[in-house]
Amino acid sequence: NITDEGLKYLSGIHTLNLCSNKNITNEGLKYLSGIHTLYLNWNQNITNEGLKYLSGIHTLYLNCNKKITDEGLKYLSGIHTLNLSCNKNITDEGLKYLSGIHTLDL
């Protein structure tokens, strides 16, 4: 599996799939801000704190991440397409942060 250390070499990538990667943490996400499309489904170590590094991404898949809550959504308002399906800690309260998103999957 890819670790945070390896992510710093991927800045020019257009689309990156890191689904179910147990070694990626919030620290590694700071290297991914220039990526167009990012898949982070089923990543158990990604929390609200890491989402602040992802605001410049065009398309983001965050399906099934148990540690993402309403509070973290405030960092995602500039994203064009966002998939948050199967995130049990996202409630009506968090939707106030997502009004500018073009395509949203809950």
Indicate residue ranges for each PLM-predicted region.
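Concave beta-strand-loop units of leucine-rich repeat
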Residues: 1-2, 12-24, 34-46, 56-68, ...
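The feature encodes a structural signal of leucine-rich repeats
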Residues: 4-8, 26-30, 48-52, 69-74, ...
